[in-house]
Each structure stands twice: as C-alpha cells, then as structure tokens.
Regions:
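Gram-negative bacterial Sec-dependent N-terminal signal peptides
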Residues: 1-23
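A residue-level marker of the well-folded mature domains of exported/periplasmic proteins
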Residues: 23-212
Length: 212
C-alpha cells in the first residue's frame, strides 16, 4: 500500500471521529468497491481501525452505478448519519445538490472542493509527492526511459503525471517520459487489463521504471 493510500486511511479515521459524538457516521465508496486495492480500500481500512479503537460502528455502501451517488447521500442524511464521507472527486456534483438540503449534517469529500458550510473538502498536493517519485525513477532507470500510467484522464491525474515528469527531468534532463491513461470514463479506474497492456507497451519502448 502506498503512502498516499495509508494517509487516506488516516483521513477516513479522522473524519469518522469528527462526528462520532453526533450519530452513526457513514462511508460511501466510489465505483470499484471497498476492496479495490486503492483509495476505497484505504478508506475502508481507516474506518475499520476507527471502529476497533472506539468501539463504535459506521454505515457503508458500495455504489454500483453513477446514478446512485445522490441517492446514497440522501438516504444516509435522512437516516441521520453524521458525518457522511465520500471517497472520491466524482461525488462533487451530487454533494453540491444535496449538502444545502441537510444543513445539520456534516459531509466530507476527498479529492474535490465543494463550497458549502457543512462540507469538509480534503485535497492533496499530489504533484509534490509525484515529483519525488519522478526523481527516484530517473535515478533508478538504466535506460533513461521511464513511464507513467494514470487512470481516468482528468485534471487530478494529470497533476500526478505532471509532478512525476518534472521530477524525472530534475534528476535527469535527458530522460524520456512515456505517459498514458487507461481511459476517459469512470470505467478507467477498474481496467487492469488496459493497465497491463499499457505497461507492456511502455516496457517495449524502453521504460524500465513505470509509475502507475
């Protein structure tokens, strides 16, 4: 598990604690499920740790479609869950529609900013960590060619890619950076076959270090 996912688990645990005295909190996982070996799973791990340490419980739901985002938010808010935590930027639009209808409910969203008094937005300087990864990749590479593979092609993932490329160039100005995304729709987050194909393609082009 990466440092970022470990930190996300800590964020989830902290966010749950913020409303523990108010009501049973809720955690809404993004598409991909709570065992995605990524952000969802990190958040689930943090929530489990919080439950074990405090003896409290939390509600949860794994979404099956985009249409369920607003539905899940309203369902938990109506049930009195507080706070309600979402594990990804894709909840932004739905939360913008819902937050104002439940002013006494606290919401937490990760990787997106929603400007509302009852919303806590958790964002990261992704490019900074990726810059350091890029420097290490350049120093480790023996071919002077390294790769980057992102998920859905969105500004957030481009921040990872940009920081990585700049770190590579800082350590080795002559290095080549090959960059690919697995797709342009949410399905890109759960496409290991495409990720494998892109990795093999980058290796065939000389990349001996790939950041994904």
């Amino acid at each position: 598990m990466t440092l970022m996912t470990k930190f996300l688990g800590a964020v989830a645990a902290t966010a749950l604690s913020a409303g523990a005295a108010l009501a049973e909190p809720a955690l809404i996982f993004d598409l991909g499920g709570k065992f995605d070996k990524s952000f969802n799973e990190a958040a689930f791990g943090g929530a489990q740790r919080w439950a074990k340490e405090t003896g409290n419980t939390f509600r949860e739901i794994e979404l099956q479609s985009e249409a369920q985002r607003e539905q899940a938010l309203r369902r938990f808010a109506e049930a009195g869950s507080n706070p309600i935590i979402m594990t990804g930027f894709a909840f932004g639009d739905a939360l913008g529609q819902v937050a104002g209808d439940y002013p006494d409910t606290d919401f937490v969203i990760i990787d997106m900013v929603v400007d509302a008094p009852n919303v806590r937005s958790v964002v990261f300087n992704e490019h900074e960590g990726s810059y350091l990864v890029g420097m290490m990749a350049a120093m480790a590479s023996k071919t002077n060619t390294v790769g980057f593979i992102g998920g859905m092609d969105i500004p957030l993932i481009r921040k990872f890619a940009c920081g990585y490329a700049q770190g590579v160039k800082a350590a080795n100005p002559d290095a080549t950076v090959i960059s690919n995304m697995t797709g342009t729709t949410p399905a890109a987050w759960n496409d290991p076959v495409k990720g494998s194909e892109l990795t093999k393609a980058q290796i065939s082009q000389g990349a001996d270090v790939v950041y994904a």
